[in-house]
Structure formats: structure tokens, C-alpha cells
Amino acid sequence: MNLFRFLGDLSHLLAIILLLLKIWKSRSCAGISGKSQVLFAVVFTARYLDLFTNYISLYNTCMKVVYIACSFTTVWMIYSKFKATYDGNHDTFRVEFLVIPTAILAFLVNHDFTPLEILWTFSIYLESVAILPQLFMVSKTGEAETITSHYLFALGVYRTLYLFNWIWRYHFEGFFDLIAIVAGLVQTVLYCDFFYLYITKVLKGKKLSLPA
């Protein structure tokens, strides 16, 4: 495992922990898209169904368990524990427009037409657009809390580092995964506008807002 992959995993883990702490400490999930979190739970479930059949390393297994557990814990807090604070009126993105096309694409474009491989491919495609309901919600409300901005920024850094990970692997290992790279590029592009606003506003102590 190279440094970019490791730092990407740490950034991803930091994003998840920031979100969980934000919800738990404030006793509120206001400003958080439950739909995005459900999509992420679907992503990790589909991707890591090989948990009991494909052992790579203790690190790999632990990260899989943490991602699945944290994603479902987040969904539980939003839709059960702190349901009264969930802003469903602004979380209105039509997720079927994300799930159905990515599922169809996974059947059509994959590395191997087997159940686990199709599910893995589906998770890669879906993850690339899973943040859209959250960005749509921020755009609709006009602003985001600072901690939510930190969460989104950490996710964006994770995806950017993973792109460097693919470049590293291609250069030093000769490994090239076009599906993962293209999906990663799509996801990184979605964060570009947010990165600019984060750097120009949040890091200067201002509140983040996206164009409506």
C-alpha cells in the first residue's frame, strides 16, 4: 500500500468520524442529507460483500468493517435517533436518478460478469455521485455549517488522494483500473466548486454557501 492510498483512507475515515461526532455532539442531523448517507451505506455494503470470502489483510478487513458500521450508524442516527432534527424538506434529490443508471451501467461495463464484481462496479459508480444529494441540499438551503464543510472537504481530499494512488500504482506497479479512475475523476470534479468555496470562505472564517 502506497502513501497516497493510506492518506486517502485516513482522510475518508476522518470525514466519517467528523460527521458522526457532529451529529452526536449537537444531537442534531440538521444540514446533513440522509439520502447521501443511505447511498454511502449502499456503496459500502455492495463493495464489501466479499468480507467473509476474500481476505487481503487485517488492515483491509478492519477498514471494511469500520466503513459499513459507521455508514449504517449514521443512517440510524438520521432516520431514528435524531429523526426530529432531520431536514427532509430540503433533502429532496431524486436518488433513483443516481441508483438506476449506475446499476444499469454496472451490468454493461464491468471487469467480470459475476455477482460480486458487478456489485463492486456498481459501488464504484454510485460512490462517484452519492454526494450529489448533500451538495444539492447545501445549494437549496444556501449555506452549510462549518463542521459539515469540513466533512465534505475531507471527502474531497480522500477522492483526490485516491487519484494520485491510481497514478502511483500505474507508474510503479503497472496496474490500471479504468473504471475506478474515471469514476474517481467524476467524483473529484463534483467537489471542485466546493473546494474553491471552502478555501476562499471557510478557511477565512466565513460561512460556506453554494450558488442556488
From Swiss-Prot:
Q: Where in the cell is it found?
A: Golgi apparatus membrane; Cytoplasmic vesicle, COPI-coated vesicle membrane; Endoplasmic reticulum membrane; Endoplasmic reticulum-Golgi intermediate compartment membrane
Origin: domain of life: Eukaryota
Question: GO cellular-component terms in the record?
Answer: cis-Golgi network; COPI-coated vesicle membrane; endoplasmic reticulum; endoplasmic reticulum membrane; endoplasmic reticulum-Golgi intermediate compartment membrane; Golgi membrane
User: Phosphoserine modification sites?
Assistant: S209
Report the membrane topology from the UniProt record: Multi-pass membrane protein
Keyword Endoplasmic reticulum listed? The answer is yes
* Site (described: Interaction with the K-D-E-L motif on target proteins): R5, E117
Location of region: Interaction with the K-D-E-L motif on target proteins: 47-48, 159-169
**What does the PTM comment of the record read?**
Phosphorylation by PKA at Ser-209 is required for endoplasmic reticulum retention function.
- Please tell me whether the keyword S-adenosyl-L-methionine is annotated for this protein: no
Region ranges (Important for recycling of cargo proteins with the sequence motif K-D-E-L from the Golgi to the endoplasmic reticulum): 204-207
Major site of localization recorded for this protein: Golgi
Q: Which residues lie on this side of the membrane: Lumenal?
A: 1-4, 53-58, 111-116, 169-178
> What's a single GO MF annotation on this record?
KDEL sequence binding
Q: What Pfam families has UniProt attached to this entry?
A: ER_lumen_recept
Q: What does this protein do?
A: Receptor for the C-terminal sequence motif K-D-E-L that is present on endoplasmic reticulum resident proteins and that mediates their recycling from the Golgi back to the endoplasmic reticulum.
Oligomeric form and interacting partners = Upon ligand binding the receptor oligomerizes and interacts with components of the transport machinery such as ARFGAP1 and ARF1.
UniProt lists the family membership as follows: Belongs to the ERD2 family.
For this entry, the protein name equals ER lumen protein-retaining receptor 1
Q: Which organism is it from?
A: Bos taurus
Q: What is the lineage of its organism?
A: Eukaryota, Metazoa, Chordata, Craniata, Vertebrata
